[in-house]
């Protein structure tokens, strides 16, 4: 059986990456392992330090990439992270960038208990489409897809659409 693709799901924090990844892992036509990269970094202590001011970890990217490389080689992976430019271009078969209206995003981050400064920073990043630009400058345009993640209907249709893409990808792998 063909191994599964490597799908990067990225977007500003709160856009719905983990929600999409969990549903996709459940509904995918081929088994996919969901790696929440932020959690992975914490669990495996792949960071240099904890930044108190921003309440985030400064990731040790070299160690992170070494750690993920064997999993990527196996395939069948969802990499869920708020940034994507650190990953080697060859890793990704598909890069999904989730987008959300900034007032909705603000509410989601507030509900998460983020400090105001962090909400403002992320909100601004979403308005300026920082993650989308990052994805577009790091990967071939044909593998980058921008999807709206504002409501449950978006969530369901996005996951169905990515599932359809996986089915085609598998067929292409078999015939090549
Ligand atoms: N498409 C969506 N429609 C409605 N709520 C969503 C959607 N995507 C995410 N959410 C909600 O927004 C919050 C943040 O989602 P999450 O998946 O944790 O975001 P991320 O992983 O990008 O930080 C959660 O409460 C989740 O239920």
Predicted regions and their residues:
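Phosphate-binding P-loop
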Residues: 1-4
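NTP-dependent small-molecule kinase module
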Residues: 106-107, 114, 136-176
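P-loop (Walker A) phosphate-binding loop of NTP-binding proteins
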Residues: 12
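A glycine- and Lys/Arg-enriched "phosphate-lid" helix/loop adjacent to the NTP-binding pocket
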Residues: 49, 99-143
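ATP-binding Walker
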Residues: 15
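ATP-dependent small-molecule kinase phosphotransfer cores
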Residues: 30-87
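Walker A/P-loop
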Residues: 18
């Amino acid at each position: 059986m063909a191994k599964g693709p490597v799908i990067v799901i990225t977007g500003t924090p709160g856009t719905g990456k983990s929600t999409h990844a969990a549903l996709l892992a459940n509904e995918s036509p081929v088994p996919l392992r969901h790696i929440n990269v932020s959690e992975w970094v914490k669990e495996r202590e792949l960071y240099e330090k904890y930044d108190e001011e921003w309440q985030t970890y400064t990731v040790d990217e070299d160690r992170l990439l070494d750690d993920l490389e064997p999993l990527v080689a196996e395939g069948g992976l969802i990499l869920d992270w708020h940034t994507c430019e650190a990953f080697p271009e060859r890793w990704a078969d598909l890069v999904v960038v989730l987008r959300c209206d900034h007032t909705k995003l603000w509410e989601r981050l507030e509900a998460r208990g983020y400090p105001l400064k962090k909400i403002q920073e992320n909100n601004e990043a979403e308005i300026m489409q920082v993650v989308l630009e990052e994805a577009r400058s790091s990967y071939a345009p044909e593998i980058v897809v921008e999807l709206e993640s504002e409501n449950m209907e978006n969530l369901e249709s996005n996951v169905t659409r990515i599932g359809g893409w996986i089915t085609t990808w598998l067929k292409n792998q078999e015939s090549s």
